[in-house]
Amino acid sequence: MDPYKYRPSSSFNAPMWSTNSGAPVWNNDNSLTVGSRGPILLEDYHLVEKIADFDRERIPERVVHARGATAKGFFEVTHDVSHLTCADFLRAPGVQTPVIVRFSTVIHERGSPETLRDPRGFAIKFYTREGNWDLVGNNFPVFFIRDGMKFPDMVHALKPNPKTHIQENWRILDFFSHHPESLHMFTFLFDDIGVPADYRHMDGSGVNTYTLVNRAGKAHYVKFHWKPTCGVKSLLEEEAVTVGGTNHSHATKDLTDSIAAGNYPEWTFYIQTIDPDYEERFDFDPLDVTKTWPEDVVPLQPVGRLVLNRNIDNFFSENEQLAFCPGIIVPGVYYSDDKLLQTRIFSYSDTQRHRLGPNYLLLPANAPKCSHHNNHYDGLMNFMHRDEEVDYFPSRFDPAKHAPRYPIPSRTLNGRREKMVIEKENNFKQPGERYRSMDPARQERFINRWIDALSDPRLTHEIKAIWLSYWSQADKSLGQKLASRLSSKPSM
């Protein structure tokens, strides 16, 4: 059934003003009163409806990724990957799929400046012939934590102090001092790329490890990457202050203006793949979201290109009501046992049901563009017009049947029930390698940002010592420089 066919806006084109129920409104300027100066009458239904509507215009803000910008376009396959996946939208070079993409900051509120040091969200909804696929990622290829159990605590630590509503370094560094796996993420966040110049000049990553499955059922672990064809650009501190002080929505404006001018943003889509049969060859766990896969060992393979060539028509319906979930996949793409991904599969859909209601997938931006059929009926704000008499399965009165079976990973798993960390933590090697890959000037800026963070007057000597130990294990010279600068810095 076409979800657009019965949407309320299909008849929202009257030349005269009316109420929500369609009654004509002859005066939208004055309230109904007793005389010209008398009290307002409660029977002024139009006034009550208008104010009540206004009072309910805002919906719950996203708990993370509240500040965002959206655009539409297409994804086109440029290289054959049919040997790796049976996904229909990747079936052959030249195949195009419509998409909608949402960029965002992560921690800060809706309306906050787009020049703050913060990860950026990079989420794509592919409207494929086999249903939607949501690839929900960030601009950095790694994350702070590897187990979803810590996600609420992590967000609380990064968010403002619940007493003062001020984001404070002592809270952030206190929490992450218990999680050395966060070091790798901090080599990105405190690097020059921690403040992207705009959304067009920004990398994207699926972050988590997924699985590609071909028609024969062979599975490969996969990492997804987006590289902007116009290159990566970032803002240093002084530039961020200048840009943010001029326009706190500069990245949204840049995206909108560029598309309107025909300067369409474009990214090349790459994958990295690992055969699960050989995952033990690495000194890290391929399912560890705090690790990257070395490109000299696991090379990037080009797959396609993403082009954004249309601005959205309505911010609320195509940004605020737009909803993503890593659990929404298509045949040929599957999950992995990445602990953070496993948590996200539930968390994202759950928060959308809270934010938008149980029928959020019926909203036009979230509904599939292919035909679909199930017995998910009724519920709050279900506006789908259905005239079936059979709302159960199976039935001899309803011709709907199971879809053809498609392959999913078939590995046999065994183990004890237990709560524990992964065996190959290896928390310090990759952060050290990334720091050493920076040129001296970039290293100096990285160190200065850490000196500033570690100089928070509420940080204890113990917490500072832990961070110096962590960075020394990543790179001895880095630890020494941080210790030297901190010891010579006058106390408050």
From Swiss-Prot:
It comes from the Eukaryota. It is an enzyme of class 1 (oxidoreductase). Signal peptide: none annotated. It catalyses: 2 H2O2 = O2 + 2 H2O. Keywords: Glyoxysome, Heme, Hydrogen peroxide, Iron, Metal-binding, Oxidoreductase, Peroxidase, Peroxisome. Heme binds at residue 348. SMART domains: Catalase (SM01060). InterPro entries: Catalase, Catalase_AS, Catalase_clade1/3, Catalase_core, Catalase_haem_BS, Catalase_immune_responsive, Catalase_sf. GO terms for biological process: hydrogen peroxide catabolic process; response to hormone; response to hydrogen peroxide. It is found in: Peroxisome; Glyoxysome. The keyword Metal-binding applies. Its cofactor is heme. Its EC number is 1.11.1.6. Homotetramer. Occurs in almost all aerobically respiring organisms and serves to protect cells from the toxic effects of hydrogen peroxide. Belongs to the catalase family. PANTHER family: CATALASE (PTHR11465), CATALASE-2 (PTHR11465:SF23). This is Catalase-1.
